[in-house]
Amino acid sequence: MFSRLLCFLSAGVLMAQVAPTDAGGIARAALDRLLSQKYSELSAMLTPQAKAAYSEAALAKMGAEIQSWGAVQSVGDPMVRKIGTASIVAFQVKFATQTITFQFSVTQEGALAVMLHSPVAPVWQHPPYSKPDAFKEREVTVGEGQWRLPGTLTVPVGQGPFPGVVLVHDGGPGDRDESIGAVKVFRDLAEGLASRGVAVLRYEKRTKQYPQAAQAKDYTVEKETLEDAGLALALLRAQPEVKPGRVFLLGYGLGGYVAPRIAEADGKLAGMVVVNANARPLEDVTLDEAKFRKVTGAQMQLLIEQAAKIKKLSQGDEDTAPLLGMSGPYLLDLQGYSPTGLAKLLGVPMLILQGERDYLLGTKDFDVWKTSLAGQKNVTLKSYPALDRVLVAGQGPSTEADERKPGQHVAQDVIDDVATWMNQ
């Protein structure tokens, strides 16, 4: 799935010049190869499992994005922390246009397990529509055991119980705030909605809290998103300030795409909000993303060929080599899935919102939602001509660079529309 945070699965190091136990040195060597576009040397560092997952298409996609940031101006010292037996090594790299944090997970054997990168966001400030005196926050834990996730519950002040909503992430390893550049989509939504009488639960995505989760052989959208969303809904219903029969789901991007599946599994949703979400298959959206990133020639042809192979997958192809960065089990989990078709069968109240300046989707998928669900009395649709991928208002074509401008927030119109719909 498209994302501001691209997750690259990699592992295994063959480097005579770096001691296997030197996690910082191993990570820095990998970073140097990445920045200098020495992809064959980077590939030589991968274990067989990672080589299977770390496709040429993913390398091409990564390289194109990194080159777009301009020349490297400085690389910070490694910051190392332990999670279990793994070492997480982070570097801040200053490019001509922005500063990026790269994170590497290094196993105790000296293997690279995961690599992530994300922009360093400016200091966040409350949006003008947030009323801090009108809500309170507390830390909660979603789930238990191996994949328990830290979260934040934002609750209106006053006499409840209140309607509540769980926020579900886009693709990639998102944090609980759904931080994208300088914009914190979920934090804005949480404070804005809580200021208007709606309790909000947001949490760290599993692949953010546990990067190794994406490497599991049985990794699917069920493991990535659905399981934790279901647990979060149950947790929200159990809160004394929340009215159990008025619990909603808000899915952003990928979260909106799979919202009907979450609703089907839950069976008790008061409604679901779908925001800037594709209605078409992931492989189709990925090709659109490649065009946006100006991938051409042989690289684009490779993506087209892999998308065609995805269309032909069938049960029994679980062991197929990853296509467009997605494993066989992940792709088969979504094979034949139609979010609009399932939504129509469920009959759950829906609010579908789309920023028309979304540089990846535009209104193409919104039109699919609109056409497919035409005549459904339980469905409300609205598009915003001025809003972009992160629901920020602007003019003209939007770009990823827009997301890095400080002081931007989700538009108040979105907050008001969602709160009004949930409180009706």
What are these regions (language model features)?
Residues 25, 29-32, 36-87:
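Short solvent-exposed beta->alpha transition segments
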Residues 122-159:
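N-terminal cap/lid segment of alpha/beta-hydrolase-fold proteins
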Residues 218-240:
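Alpha/beta-hydrolase active-site loop
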Residues 346, 352-354:
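Short beta-strand/loop motif that positions the catalytic acidic residue
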Residues 359-365:
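Conserved alpha/beta-hydrolase "acid-adjacent" motif
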Residues 390, 395-424:
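Catalytic active-site module of serine/aspartate enzymes centered on a nucleophile-bearing elbow/loop
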